[in-house]
């Protein structure tokens, strides 16, 4: 027998007042331009949006609660499924939080490999953004070209960890593997080729009349709005605020490499597009410097700390103590000291951070993920008001959200 629910549907609590001159429509959750299971309730006056309400939760999986029932190492593959376009960024942010909790310092080579993975992942994320954003506006050629280059980078990532999207490539205390043979040569070959591809994209879009009409003065975000709504990443830098966590609070070896922080002052969709295009070039600059840093590092890729990190495979197979220590870590999990940490990082979409409260056991007492797409999606409530229905899809694509990290 079905028990009647006392809870009213979510949409019944939304204060939309139907008037003769206005119309309420649903954009999504099954819509090709929603970039996931996002539902937007829009109130229109003609074709102009007068009220907007994003409705999320269609892909909610309870990841933060899942973390409370897993040992610390078990949760790493789950982070892949948050922003599944930038899995390495999620892996790193989580591992960095646990390492800070345990007081671990990773080897220099592991830090370089992490930076390589993060910047390659940033490029693949930005390429997917440009491809889908251009497709939303009708630029089919750019969509195909971006996927062509993205395949090359995905092949590089796959050569390292065996996966194209859900990498699980990092470990608490370091990384899973050293770089394969000839990896740096292939990466540098891409770094030499990709600037020409970027120029092709810009030749197709920069002065394209339709592209500029659909992006200039569309989706304008002021400095005050960006700060008030918690915007980060390109959403913040496109409004004139030159803030990048890799510069402001350097982690890994970002303080040892030279790179710029692209920004624009107009705050519209076109300004954010120009920031993204420049970020490609800065990532290439970082990758070239990482190739130089890698050559000056010793071969260790995991921290040496038996309480939290397993020994090398060779030691596990030849030394009784290392085997026992590995068995305990895998079956019982590591036990960080009691305390709280929050570690912010600069993911391709903005500030991605993990808060962990440890009670001294092998499982986190509380884990909270601060994901950029969640805040940017909430901003639609104000950002879309006053725009036209035809521009809603263009703005959604430009903001660059992914529902995996919104719903979690």
From Swiss-Prot:
Q: Which domain of life is it from?
A: Bacteria
Task: Assign the protein's first listed, main location to one coarse class.
Answer: membrane
A Gene Ontology cellular-component term: plasma membrane
Record keyword Kinase present: no
Quote the Gene3D superfamilies the UniProt record gives: Cytochrome-c3 Hydrogenase, chain B (1.10.645.10)
The protein's location, in the record's own words, is: Cell inner membrane
Return the EC number.
7.1.1.-
Query: Which InterPro entries does this UniProt record tie to the protein?
Result: NADH_Q_OxRdtase_suD, NDH1_su_D/H, NiFe-Hase_large
Q: Which HAMAP family does the entry mention? A: NDH1_NuoD
Task performed by this protein:
NDH-1 shuttles electrons from NADH, via FMN and iron-sulfur (Fe-S) centers, to quinones in the respiratory chain. The immediate electron acceptor for the enzyme in this species is believed to be ubiquinone. Couples the redox reaction to proton translocation (for every two electrons transferred, four hydrogen ions are translocated across the cytoplasmic membrane), and thus conserves the redox energy in a proton gradient.
Could you say which protein family the record assigns here?
Belongs to the complex I 49 kDa subunit family.
Q: What is this protein called?
A: NADH-quinone oxidoreductase subunit D
Organism lineage reads as: Bacteria, Pseudomonadati, Campylobacterota, Epsilonproteobacteria, Campylobacterales
């Amino acid at each position: 027998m079905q028990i009647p629910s006392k809870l009213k549907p979510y949409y019944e609590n939304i204060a939309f007042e139907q008037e003769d001159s206005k119309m309420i429509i649903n954009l999504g959750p099954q819509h090709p331009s929603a970039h996931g299971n996002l539902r937007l309730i829009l109130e229109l006056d003609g074709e102009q949006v007068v009220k907007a309400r994003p409705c999320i939760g269609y892909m909610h999986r309870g990841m933060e609660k899942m973390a409370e029932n897993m040992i610390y190492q078990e949760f790493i593959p789950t982070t892949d499924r948050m922003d599944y376009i930038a899995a390495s960024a999620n892996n790193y942010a989580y591992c960095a939080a646990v390492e800070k909790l345990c007081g671990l310092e990773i080897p220099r080579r592991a830090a370089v490999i992490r930076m390589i993975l993060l910047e390659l992942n940033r490029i693949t994320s930005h390429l997917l953004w440009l491809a889908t954003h251009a497709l939303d506006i009708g630029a089919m050629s750019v969509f195909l070209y971006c996927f062509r280059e993205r395949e090359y980078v995905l092949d590089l990532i796959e050569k390292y960890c065996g996966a194209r999207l859900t990498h699980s490539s990092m470990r608490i205390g370091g990384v899973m593997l050293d770089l394969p043979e000839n990896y740096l040569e292939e990466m540098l070959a891409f770094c030499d080729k990709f600037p020409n591809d970027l120029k092709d994209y810009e030749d197709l879009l920069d002065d394209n009349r339709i592209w500029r009409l659909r992006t200039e003065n569309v989706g304008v975000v002021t400095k005050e709005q960006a700060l008030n709504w918690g915007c980060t990443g390109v959403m913040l830098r496109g409004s004139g605020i030159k803030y990048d966590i890799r510069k402001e609070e350097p982690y890994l070896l970002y303080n040892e490499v030279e790179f710029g922080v692209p920004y624009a002052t107009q705050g519209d969709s076109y300004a954010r597009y120009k920031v993204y295009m420049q970020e490609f070039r800065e990532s290439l600059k970082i990758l070239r410097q990482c190739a130089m840093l890698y050559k000056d590092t010793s071969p260790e890729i995991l921290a040496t700390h038996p309480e939290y990190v397993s020994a090398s495979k060779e030691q596990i197979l030849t030394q009784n103590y290392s085997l026992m220590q590995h068995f305990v870590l895998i079956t019982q999990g590591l036990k960080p000291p009691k305390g709280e940490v929050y570690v912010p990082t600069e993911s391709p979409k903005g500030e991605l951070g993990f808060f962990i409260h440890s009670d001294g056991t092998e499982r986190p007492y509380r884990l909270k993920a601060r994901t950029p797409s969640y805040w940017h999606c909430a901003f639609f409530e104000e950002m879309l008001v006053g725009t036209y229905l035809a521009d809603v899809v263009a703005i959604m694509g430009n903001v660059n959200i992914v529902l995996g990290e919104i719903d979690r």
